[in-house]
């Protein structure tokens, strides 16, 4: 089978070549936490409203080349990168959260992620039911389906890991779609037809509760994938939504099976101080269920950031219904939710200008 892109990798390939891992040096890590603490001292406190912070509040220089290389890997390479050695020892949760935000301010425009229009979310179990019509996996400890998030890239920084489970799983949609085309071309064709996705009650004013898009689309030789079983299943329960055909159902089941084949599904435990960066157009991700610590301060905790990137590629036209536009290098994607207000609009405009991007 001919490889269609660097993102079409197998587990054996990413295990043999660890060029997608980017360790920060001691001085680079020290600069990150020093920048956060200096900003908090000058313009703090550290827990001030997150959208009040500006890129220029965080003086970064040494760490930027390593971080930039990781983002290039996500765009032009294997569609995933792991940055290691973010400062963790002696760093408070709020400092770690702000450090994640500071990195985002230097590399894109953060996007809202949920019905409450949050721009950075704490990934922590609060007892939410993942399979409910409004369930979100990041607030549960359940095993998650493979999926992509609603932005150009997603950043996950690890503050605490679970004592048991919670393993991160990544699988290349480019690889899986190549396999499906070779093994079942009828399923591959079905994956390029429209499926319906529920917005899980997070739609903003003027948006429908569901939208339609193909699971797989090829544009300029690249595979773009939207796959989220939970949202497809929830959409089927909404009145007036077109029902999937038998072939469409079989196709996504087969596609998901291919994603989970041992040769395609790469597993890693995110450790405290790790920053995982994934391309949401090509790289599907998931997580195993986990058992947590009893003490709240030890519980599995990550911080999730969705970014629109200044060097983003043009999207397939069918993606514009969710992203707002398919135009490259624009502030696009995210879920505006129910609390998208002037504060958020002003942040988007200010950060877009700082990054030289066109605001939506």
What is the predicted function of each stretch?
Residues 112-115:
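Internal, non-catalytic "lid/hinge" segments that mediate substrate recognition, gating
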Residues 1-63, 68-69, 76, 81, ...:
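Active-site environment of non-heme Fe oxygenases that use a 2-His-1-carboxylate facial triad
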Residues 94-101, 170-172:
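"Short basic amphipathic alpha-helical interaction patches in structured regions
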